[in-house]
Amino acid sequence: MEGPPLEVLKSSSPVKHSTFWLFMGLAVLVGLLTGGLVLYLHRRKRHIPTDDPIKALEPDKKLSVSNSNTIFLFGDFQIFDRDGADITKLFTPLLKELFLLLLVNSVKNGRGLYAEKLDEILWFGRSEQSVRNNRSVNMAKLKSILESIEHCQLLKEAGYWKLEFDYDFWYVDYHSYLDLIQAKEKLDEQHIRLLFELAQRGNFLSNHNYEWLDQFKAEISNEVIDVFLIYAHSAKAHNPEFLIQIANFVFNFDQVSEEAMIIKCRALSSLGKHSLAKKAFDVFIKDYRLIYNEDFNKNFNEII
């Protein structure tokens, strides 16, 4: 009676064995195909610009996790190579201005700066021969520095000099700033905090006073204030302590910003800190009087 079952077991064993290896082979094949697809999409994604600039920034991470391949333009100008070494000292005063002039314009408009405009800014009043010699020498020096740091090129295209960075390898705070600022109406608290972190290093190129830079500085100051105030007035702003930080930051750019004062006083009041709110108002009206030589036209109760 036990004979037939044994025969069944004996005959079914190789079937199960081959089926097992068939499924294993299919699993490996699916895994390889899936891995290849993920890798392809990842590489493709890195080279296709997103339609939503704020999606390019991860809100749960700091803007720069290390100084490797990093350029800071907010606060003091600093540039770090791939090993995190500060190479700012390699730039002489003229090379620094040349680099910053090309960098700011390249990041801002993607084209760089027209050659004749570059000559006019840096070597105005010199003979054509002198300009040509100075440009040639300093461009060669700049190229030499850039060749040592990789993933950055000095190019001339259609009469424009420009710097081209591979942002997969480089962090440039001004580039990240522009990504954020383009979507100012859509920013949530996480992205506002990224902008806050970025700008906390200081005003844009704060220790540099080139005449050509004034326009950029004014534009950035106005944009930062506008973005923070737009957010502070939006329905997304519900953290009074963060609103106080925003107001204080705006005061760094405009110490008599009425909007910042109102935001700060109301946020302090909502936290039950009424005496601090009144003190903030008193400081504001004192500064207002000193700057405009007239009294502010509202009292504390009107703005709360």
Where in this protein do the model-derived segments appear?
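Short, low-complexity patches enriched in S/T/P/G
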Residues: 11-23
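Intrinsically disordered, low-complexity protein-interaction/activation regions
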Residues: 21-263, 269-304
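Membrane-proximal extracellular "stem/stalk" segments
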Residues: 1-14
